[in-house]
């Protein structure tokens, strides 16, 4: 008998501190009007000093586990998608596993930048649907404020901190229908934080650098392709999509992708206005919001998609 993986709980967490566009006006040469016109972003959340990716992940995980109606001890796989880990090693997943009071089962990080949650969810699906895992915890958690050059108005206005999580369980009823992952390392310099450590010293800039126009054109192209790939694999049409939950990078990327796919705006979940770009956390944050406010309902087709530095990109098609 074929087995599938199904999302049975979602959770999220946003740091208390909110940084508005008006506050950014006093920090860097920008304006609320300029930011909103180009990105759609009104505000973003910023982690407190000493608040790490694992701390945000812990709160989101607790909410997802509670929503799933299980105990932390039932989790037998932890995957954390992050570009801003607590430390070089051990993995943030191992740190999170310990904070949850569990041990013994696999725990590891996935680093695919803003596609990280898509990569992590696809990986967990393979574990769960094959019987290698019963209940998987998948988390996207980021503290991008730590790698931000707050003097660079082209990047510092874009990003925020946060975490989102889901619990995936094995089921006879289809949940995740298919996943589709891609990468092209020839674009590795287009969007990066190119620092490295040699002999205890940081070489290169630890801050985000980005060629915005290249990112925009590439993102719209491959996000459309990733959704079409998922639809074709399941003999579905764009009209069959109940909800598109994209990576929340920029409102123009989101609306341009939806328009190319012929998906009306009212079927697109948008949180970038309030959260900014939270990288690997953006998709699970948006998913949790749409689940908790009742938009996502049983039996609906939900497409999750993301694109990030590398470039990496992908999609996951879910029957809720």
From Swiss-Prot:
<dbReference type="GO" id="GO:0044550">
    <property type="term" value="P:secondary metabolite biosynthetic process"/>
</dbReference>
<keyword id="KW-0444">Lipid biosynthesis</keyword>
<dbReference type="Pfam" id="PF08545">
    <property type="entry name" value="ACP_syn_III"/>
</dbReference>
<dbReference type="GO" id="GO:0006633">
    <property type="term" value="P:fatty acid biosynthetic process"/>
</dbReference>
<dbReference type="Pfam" id="PF08541">
    <property type="entry name" value="ACP_syn_III_C"/>
</dbReference>
<dbReference type="GO" id="GO:0004315">
    <property type="term" value="F:3-oxoacyl-[acyl-carrier-protein] synthase activity"/>
</dbReference>
<feature type="active site">
    <location>
        <position position="247"/>
    </location>
</feature>
<keyword id="KW-0511">Multifunctional enzyme</keyword>
<keyword id="KW-0275">Fatty acid biosynthesis</keyword>
<feature type="region of interest" description="ACP-binding">
    <location>
        <begin position="248"/>
        <end position="252"/>
    </location>
</feature>
<dbReference type="InterPro" id="IPR004655">
    <property type="entry name" value="FabH"/>
</dbReference>
<keyword id="KW-0012">Acyltransferase</keyword>
<feature type="active site">
    <location>
        <position position="114"/>
    </location>
</feature>
<dbReference type="InterPro" id="IPR013747">
    <property type="entry name" value="ACP_syn_III_C"/>
</dbReference>
<dbReference type="InterPro" id="IPR013751">
    <property type="entry name" value="ACP_syn_III_N"/>
</dbReference>
<protein>
    <recommendedName>
        <fullName>Beta-ketoacyl-[acyl-carrier-protein] synthase III</fullName>
        <ecNumber>2.3.1.180</ecNumber>
    </recommendedName>
</protein>
<dbReference type="InterPro" id="IPR016039">
    <property type="entry name" value="Thiolase-like"/>
</dbReference>
<keyword id="KW-0276">Fatty acid metabolism</keyword>
<keyword id="KW-0443">Lipid metabolism</keyword>
<dbReference type="GO" id="GO:0005737">
    <property type="term" value="C:cytoplasm"/>
</dbReference>
<comment type="function">
    <text>Catalyzes the condensation reaction of fatty acid synthesis by the addition to an acyl acceptor of two carbons from malonyl-ACP. Catalyzes the first condensation reaction which initiates fatty acid synthesis and may therefore play a role in governing the total rate of fatty acid production. Possesses both acetoacetyl-ACP synthase and acetyl transacylase activities. Its substrate specificity determines the biosynthesis of branched-chain and/or straight-chain of fatty acids.</text>
</comment>
<keyword id="KW-0808">Transferase</keyword>
<comment type="pathway">
    <text>Lipid metabolism; fatty acid biosynthesis.</text>
</comment>
<comment type="subunit">
    <text>Homodimer.</text>
</comment>
<dbReference type="GO" id="GO:0033818">
    <property type="term" value="F:beta-ketoacyl-acyl-carrier-protein synthase III activity"/>
</dbReference>
<comment type="similarity">
    <text>Belongs to the thiolase-like superfamily. FabH family.</text>
</comment>
<keyword id="KW-0963">Cytoplasm</keyword>
<feature type="active site">
    <location>
        <position position="277"/>
    </location>
</feature>
